A protein has these predicted regions:
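Metzincin-family zinc-dependent endopeptidase catalytic domain
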Residues: 2-150, 156, 208-212, 216-254
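Residue-level detector of conserved, well-ordered beta-strand and adjacent loop positions
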Residues: 35, 64, 140, 205, ...
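Acidic glycine-/aspartate-rich tracts in secreted/extracellular proteins
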Residues: 38-41, 68, 99-103, 144-146, ...
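Acidic, glycine-rich calcium-binding repeat modules characteristic of RTX/beta-roll
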Residues: 74-84, 107-125, 131, 143-167, ...
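Extracytoplasmic and endomembrane cell-envelope/extracellular-matrix remodeling and assembly machinery
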Residues: 155-199, 208, 212, 216-231, ...
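Low-complexity acidic/polar repeat-biased segments
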Residues: 163, 250-251, 260, 268, ...
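Extracellular repeat-rich scaffold modules on cell surfaces
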Residues: 229, 233-307
Length: 392
């Protein structure tokens, strides 16, 4: 029951859909029904649901109890959030409110996921750009068969989606509109740091406050990417994963839009800050004004396109990737000339330097793009690379 309640809350948190508990009343206003079945009635499936418009059973959600409990009601498998079996409840509820599998054509011959056909292997084929898989959508059957390095290759008690994926969120918002008031405070999203029961992936839909993804307790390298899912024909359609190395779990960030126009940012779902840990981390910003703090280790910090970013590498040999574009400005607060490097994706001759009190201003074609605090000179040969941004 709690998993179904959590599933309903998860859908309401991101969309305009709301659920009202009418108890056991059997009347025409009831849109969703929940049942438990045994193995014989469920035909061996984990569960099933009837989508709107199917027949008189539309809105029915059935869970095969025998897949989860023994005959004396003892648990067979973990159903903790993030477990292989735990996602069934959210998966089936999504069907009941109108979402289909990416690999099939639904009731009315809707398009399959890009790159899939009726001959595709529904358990292994992740489609175009490998996005038909966890952690990008929980409606897929490509979970432990994804082999993408983000999720386990067996039915584990951790490592899979705990929530809707970014692609699921977009589909629900297209149907029901967005929830513009979700997580509107100052939120901190802490990276999971171990492969233990109940850990897994979450897609963030956060519409307010100054927020941060935090990996400060990590002993292993972390990647924190503040960019939103693109929903485009690319390998970031379902999001840019943020996680600790070797851990199956972390975050993606849902597409930032108003539920109507995919091509324009609504400025709602924005995560502003990132904090690394004690190893060599990779921190990537977005179009907002970001504060990126690498802490220990040899870190890479990239403020992204747009905004006034503040970059702090911390101890170690750090790289600061500086975007040369109008409207984007990075302040590097702790550049260590004997250790650190700047990286640009433009030619050396397009850049110039000028002193500003105790700081050094960097300009691209006379447009200010960066300020090095407490630095009075720069050695172009040893402290600067013009290799571009590899791996973005």
């Amino acid at each position: 029951r709690q998993l179904l309640l959590d599933a309903m809350q998860g859908i309401a948190d991101v969309s305009g859909l709301r659920f009202i508990d009418r108890g056991d009343n059997n009347d025409d206003n009831v849109e969703l029904w929940f049942y438990t079945l045994d193995r014989r009635d469920a035909d061996g499936s984990y569960g099933f649901a009837y989508t709107p418009g199917s027949d008189f059973d539309e809105g029915l959600v059935a869970i095969n109890r025998s897949m989860y409990q023994t005959s004396d009601f003892k648990p067979k498998h973990s159903i903790a959030p993030g477990s292989f079996y735990g996602i069934t409840f959210l998966h089936e509820l999504c069907h009941a409110v109108g979402l289909k599998h990416p690999h099939d054509s639904g009731l009315k011959q809707q398009p399959r996921f890009p790159g899939l056909t009726r001959r595709s292997n529904q358990y292994r084929d992740s489609g175009m750009f490998n996005q038909n898989a966890h952690p990008f959508t929980q409606l897929t059957y490509v979970d432990k068969g994804a082999r993408n390095g983000y999720v386990p290759t067996a039915a584990a008690d951790h490592g899979f989606l705990q929530t809707l994926g970014a692609l699921d969120i977009a589909a629900l918002q297209w149907l029901y509109g967005i929830n513009p008031n979700a997580s509107s405070g100052r939120d901190v999203y802490r990276l999971p740091l171990s492969n233990t029961e109940g850990m897994g992936w979450r897609a963030i839909w956060d519409t307010g406050g100054i927020d941060r993804i935090d990996g400060s307790l990590a002993e292993m390298p972390v990647t924190i990417d503040l960019r939103n899912a693109t929903l485009g024909q690319d390998d970031a359609a379902g999001g840019y994963p943020s996680s600790a190395e070797g851990v199956f779990g972390g975050f993606t960030i849902a597409h930032d839009w108003n539920g109507v126009d995919l091509t324009e940012s609504a400025g709602l779902c924005i995560i502003e800050h990132a904090t690394g840990g004690r190893a060599g981390d990779r921190l990537i910003g977005n179009q907002a004004s970001n504060r990126l703090r690498g802490r220990r280790g040899d870190d890479v910090l990239y403020g992204g396109l747009g905004g006034k970013d503040r970059l702090v590498g911390g101890p170690g040999r750090d790289q600061f990737w500086i975007e040369a574009v109008s409207g984007s400005f990075a302040t590097v607060r702790d550049f260590q000339p004997e250790l650190d490097q700047l990286v640009f994706d433009v030619p050396r001759e397009s850049l110039s330097l000028s002193s500003q009190a105790d700081d050094l201003l960097i300009q691209w074609r006379d447009i200010p793009i960066a300020l090095l605090k407490g630095v009075d000179s720069l050695d172009w040969s040893s402290q600067v690379l013009f290799s571009g941004f590899q791996g973005l």
